[in-house]
Amino acid sequence: MSRIGKEPITIPSGVETKIDGQLVEVKGPKGTLNVNVPEPISVAVEDGKIVVTRPDDHRTNRSLHGLSRSLVNNLVVGVTEGYTIKMEIFGVGYRVALKGKDLEFSLGYSHPVLIEASEGITFAVDGNTKLSVSGIDKQKVGQVAAVIRRLRKDDPYKGKGIRYEGEQIRRKVGKTGK
């Protein structure tokens, strides 16, 4: 059995789970999320725990088993705790500001770059070089953070750009003149 898939997911207090065929819906203090579990995988609630099972040991079913369990676990964690990704901006003149719910970046381009907050995503700015992306959906939070990082990827020669907090950038040595 899948080591990830066979672990049951404990349902914390204040969280409601509704299973309708392949659709799993989780309601908690921070909101409601749902996911469609792939077809051969079945999900059930037993003794206050969510159990994900597969019909047989076929290769695709084994891989979908762990995936489905992780997706359902992400829902439970999202509606109880939420997800936050912290980011840092490095570079002279590079800064970020909060404009209403949206972010405005100055990244050395001839124009400011505006990132709109999609539904369920909130931004927080600390100073003008640190920001955090928060929400209950792990996939949405990660996608928005990746879009922000792609605005100005880290430069390995000068170390300028946007990076995740704690991310180490391998620095390269530039050309040496004669």
UniProtKB/Swiss-Prot annotation:
Q: Do you know which Pfam families this protein is assigned to?
A: Ribosomal_L6 (PF00347)
InterPro entries, A to Z: Ribosomal_uL6-like, Ribosomal_uL6-like_a/b-dom_sf, Ribosomal_uL6_a/b-dom, Ribosomal_uL6_bac-type
* A GO molecular-function descriptor: rRNA binding
Signal peptide location: none
Question: Keyword set for this entry?
Answer: Ribonucleoprotein, Ribosomal protein, RNA-binding, rRNA-binding
Q: Where are the transmembrane segments?
A: none
GO BP annotations listed: cytoplasmic translation
Q: Which Gene3D superfamilies match?
A: Ribosomal protein L6, alpha-beta domain (3.90.930.12)
Cystine links in this protein are none
Output the Gene Ontology cellular-component terms. cytosolic large ribosomal subunit
PANTHER family xrefs: 60S/50S RIBOSOMAL PROTEIN L6/L9, LARGE RIBOSOMAL SUBUNIT PROTEIN UL6M
Q: Which purpose does this protein serve, as stated in its record?
A: This protein binds to the 23S rRNA, and is important in its secondary structure. It is located near the subunit interface in the base of the L7/L12 stalk, and near the tRNA binding site of the peptidyltransferase center.
- NCBIfam families for this protein: L6_bact
Oligomeric state and interaction partners are given as: Part of the 50S ribosomal subunit.
Which family is this protein grouped under?
A: Belongs to the universal ribosomal protein uL6 family.
> What is this protein identified as?
Large ribosomal subunit protein uL6
Species of origin reads Corynebacterium glutamicum (strain ATCC 13032 / DSM 20300 / JCM 1318 / BCRC 11384 / CCUG 27702 / LMG 3730 / NBRC 12168 / NCIMB 10025 / NRRL B-2784 / 534)
